[in-house]
């Protein structure tokens, strides 16, 4: 089991990245909340990881904090929740926000995540309620990410990368494009910032 990687961030193509560890490039998929915290390409980075072994592939998932990894592991233990849906949930909501939704048994936020209907949301809340009783949360509510701007990038490529990342989470191309188009003053924003604002608009309403 690979539990942590420390190396140089070699590539960043949301939601995937490659970390160079002593000349070996490890490809990972990460939730958007982790992506926002990553350094620039070429800088040192450390991520906590979870390895999923399938017959046709070994898939590595990365997280900025151990707590995020533990949440991911709790989610994929649930019936009908695979890595893709777990990442979609974690990309739209910070750990504290998702835990509070479960503790309050509030399905209204969960149903805004692609792939989560009303029945699925209600089932997830019931199955996670006991597991999250001991989880502590900070007092702030719906602080999806900081409002500070992220690094500037080429507008056309940043928007294309953002749409691609949203589609990978389960949104339809039209929904993703519409969410990006609805962002005000988006000229020069990075793909990470575009993703952050679009998810905030679609989920944390």
UniProtKB/Swiss-Prot annotation:
GO cellular component: cytoplasm; Holliday junction helicase complex; Holliday junction resolvase complex
Keywords associated with the record: Cytoplasm, DNA damage, DNA recombination, DNA repair, DNA-binding
Predominant location category: cytoplasm
Location of the region described as Flexible linker in the Swiss-Prot/TrEMBL record: 144-154
Stretches the record annotates as Domain I: 1-64
InterPro entries: DNA_helicase_Holl-junc_RuvA_I (IPR013849), Hlx-hairpin-Hlx_DNA-bd_motif (IPR003583), NA-bd_OB-fold (IPR012340), RuvA (IPR000085), RuvA_2-like (IPR010994), RuvA_C (IPR011114), RuvA_C_sf (IPR036267)
SUPFAM superfamilies the record matches: DNA helicase RuvA subunit, C-terminal domain (SSF46929), Nucleic acid-binding proteins (SSF50249), RuvA domain 2-like (SSF47781)
Entries under Pfam families matching the protein: HHH_5 (PF14520), RuvA_C (PF07499), RuvA_N (PF01330)
Family: Belongs to the RuvA family.
Subunit structure: Homotetramer. Forms an RuvA(8)-RuvB(12)-Holliday junction (HJ) complex. HJ DNA is sandwiched between 2 RuvA tetramers; dsDNA enters through RuvA and exits via RuvB. An RuvB hexamer assembles on each DNA strand where it exits the tetramer. Each RuvB hexamer is contacted by two RuvA subunits (via domain III) on 2 adjacent RuvB subunits; this complex drives branch migration. In the full resolvosome a probable DNA-RuvA(4)-RuvB(12)-RuvC(2) complex forms which resolves the HJ.
Domain notes: Has three domains with a flexible linker between the domains II and III and assumes an 'L' shape. Domain III is highly mobile and contacts RuvB.
Name used for this protein in its record: Holliday junction branch migration complex subunit RuvA
Organism annotation: Pseudomonas entomophila (strain L48)
Source organism phylogeny: Bacteria, Pseudomonadati, Pseudomonadota, Gammaproteobacteria, Pseudomonadales
């Amino acid at each position: 089991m690979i539990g942590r990687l420390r190396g140089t961030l070699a590539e960043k193509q949301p939601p995937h990245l490659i970390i160079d560890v002593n000349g070996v490039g490890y490809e990972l998929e990460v939730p958007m909340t982790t992506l926002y915290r990553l350094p620039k390409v070429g800088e040192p980075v450390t991520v906590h990881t979870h390895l999923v072994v399938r017959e046709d592939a070994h898939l590595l998932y990365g997280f900025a904090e151990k707590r995020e990894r533990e949440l991911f592991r709790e989610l994929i233990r649930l019936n009908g929740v695979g890595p893709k849906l777990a990442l979609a949930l974690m990309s739209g909501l910070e750990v504290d926000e998702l835990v509070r939704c479960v503790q309050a048994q509030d399905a209204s936020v969960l149903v805004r995540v692609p792939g989560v209907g009303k029945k699925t949301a209600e089932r997830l809340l019931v199955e996670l309620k006991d597991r999250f009783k001991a989880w502590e949360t900070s007092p702030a509510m719906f602080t999806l990410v900081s409002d500070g701007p992220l690094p500037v990038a080429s507008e056309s490529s940043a928007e294309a990368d953002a749409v691609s990342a949203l589609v990978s989470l389960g949104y339809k191309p039209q929904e993703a494009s519409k969410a990006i188009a609805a962002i005000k003053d988006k000229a020069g924003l990075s793909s990470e910032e575009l993703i952050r604002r679009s998810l905030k608009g679609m989920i944390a309403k």
